[in-house]
Amino acid sequence: IQGIFARDFLDQNPNVLRLFCAFGGGGFSAGIAVFLKQLRPDIQLIGVEAEESACFVAAKAAGKPVELPSVGIFADGVAVKVMGDETFRLCNALLDDVITVSNDEICAAIKDIFDDTRVIAEPAGALSIAAVRKYVSQHNVEGEVLGAILCGSNTNFHTLRYVSERRELGDEKLDVLHIRRCA
């Protein structure tokens, strides 16, 4: 079913060069990667993890899935202590890169998403936008079509207060950021 997300995204954004996808245990990213790499192997697929729950980064370093001693709870939708063997195998083979983002970067992304679309994304869903912001800033990207899969709507007012307080610390507003809803 994850391949459907990739197909729909590509149908609506055929010129994308890099696609950023939130990463928890790896199932969503693996499903997208399997489909995407068959259809468009030229597109770079970049997994995105919360710094506090970076199980794939730890697994890549160890060469196999490892259990994290703890995970953060802010981006609870991607808070996974250990990924499965098969998802590790697929993601390790098919993802072109993985980026970690801080809670402050996630908060800034949630605000950008709200400012552009009037949608309140959950922290785990905003990981991909936070990664695009970070990637553009670190690599001085200009004129490239970057895509981000944004999913999830599980948030509450307590989380929103935290986002409001922390977003300025991760905020480096990008004038080039444009968020478009895909049907």
Model-identified regions with their sequence ranges:
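Active-site-adjacent helical/loop segments in soluble small-molecule enzymes
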Residues: Q2-I4, G84-G143
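Glycine-rich phosphate/pyrophosphate-binding loop at beta-loop-alpha junctions
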Residues: I1-A93, K134-E142, L146-R181
